[in-house]
């Protein structure tokens, strides 16, 4: 049953002028490389050296490549690491969608997504409960959130976050006003990516002024299928170049890039003023999505990255 008892806040992040172009980094974790525990019928990540090494590796790559915003998958960032990420964001003028963590709230738990800006940390709540988070006991499991937000006047534009199953709630997305959003972030831990892709394609097509959707999903065997991705519209000839290199198979059409199973991240730039390319092109109509850095096997970045986080020798 969908949760209908929630509010949508308007958060004015700053008075900064929006950047015409931003660099984004999607991070993808592999569950088996990290340590987990079950607490009150909820799967929670443990704050260990393995996780710390991965976070440091990601943030080092982000810093060295001038990233403006990072997104991590659902359940990947424990509350104990949020303060460290905020210090990093403040020092590097960066935005971080810091996955989610569970917080005890009354008899049960709330799922919190920290939206970290250079100025402060905002909290939004996951609104709807997935089948894996429910429990027959009143003091266990996740019982649904009460508050989410639209973020305005930020350097990366107007944006919102829908955590995993919340993205499938059309009523919630209607209250977030998709036509006013420039970016939608979807941190996730799910094994039905095809269903998410279908909805993302529709939402990008239906956006009047154009919108990019950034999807960061956990890779966890049968529980979560990875396939983190970026959705947006492009001129056909530009998108064809991505098809040739295997960045996308256009299934569906507005899928611009899908991370492979052995990828941990991708960095790309987005033209925030050309979110919906028109058919009427001119000499200034370029490419609104550009790949900056991939950890692809061809240049051994996967090996170097895994070595850095001590997953391999």
Report the location of each language-model feature.
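N-terminal, active-site-proximal structural segment of metallo-dependent hydrolase catalytic domains
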Residues: 1-68
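Active-site catalytic loop in hydrolytic enzyme cores
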Residues: 2-17, 105-179, 197-201, 260-270, ...
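Active-site-proximal beta-strand/loop segments in catalytic clefts of secreted hydrolases
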Residues: 27-30, 74-75, 99-102, 127, ...
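Cys-nucleophile CN-hydrolase/nitrilase-fold catalytic domain and related Cys-dependent amidase chemistry
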Residues: 41-125, 190-193, 197-202, 207-208
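Structural motif
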Residues: 68-69, 157-159, 182-183
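CN hydrolase (nitrilase-like) catalytic-core segments centered on the catalytic cysteine
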Residues: 85-97, 168-286
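A short C-terminal boundary segment appended to hydrolase-like catalytic domains
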Residues: 265-313
């Amino acid at each position: 049953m969908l949760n209908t008892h929630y509010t949508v806040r308007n958060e004015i992040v700053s008075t900064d002028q929006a950047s015409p172009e931003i660099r984004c980094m999607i991070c993808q974790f592999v569950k088996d490389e990290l340590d987990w525990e079950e607490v009150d019928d909820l799967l929670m990540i443990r704050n260990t050296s393995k996780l710390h090494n991965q976070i440091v590796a990601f943030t080092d790559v982000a810093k060295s490549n001038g990233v403006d915003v990072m997104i991590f998958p659902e359940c990947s960032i424990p509350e104990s690491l949020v303060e460290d990420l905020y210090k990093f964001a403040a020092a590097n003028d960066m935005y971080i969608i810091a996955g989610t963590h569970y917080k005890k709230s009354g008899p049960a738990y709330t799922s919190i997504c920290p939206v970290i800006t250079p100025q402060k940390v905002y909290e939004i709540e996951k609104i709807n409960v997935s089948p894996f988070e429910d429990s027959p006991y009143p003091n266990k499991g996740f019982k649904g959130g009460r508050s989410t937000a639209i973020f305005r006047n930020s350097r990366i534009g107007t944006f919102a976050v829908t955590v995993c199953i919340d993205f499938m709630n059309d009523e919630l997305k209607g209250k977030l006003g998709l036509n006013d959003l420039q970016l939608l972030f979807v941190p996730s831990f799910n094994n039905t990516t095809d269903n998410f892709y279908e909805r993302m394609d529709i939402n990008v097509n239906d956006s009047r002024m154009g919108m990019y959707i950034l999807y960061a999903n956990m890779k966890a065997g049968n529980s979560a299928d990875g396939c983190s991705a970026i959705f947006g519209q492009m001129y056909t000839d530009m998108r064809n170049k991505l098809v040739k290199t295997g960045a996308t198979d256009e299934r569906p059409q507005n899928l611009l890039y899908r991370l492979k199973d052995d990828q941990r991240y991708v960095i790309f730039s987005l033209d925030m003023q050309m979110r919906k390319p028109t058919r009427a092109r001119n000499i200034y109509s370029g490419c609104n999505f550009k790949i900056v850095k991939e950890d692809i096997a061809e240049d051994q970045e996967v090996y170097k990255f895994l070595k850095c986080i001590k997953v391999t020798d």
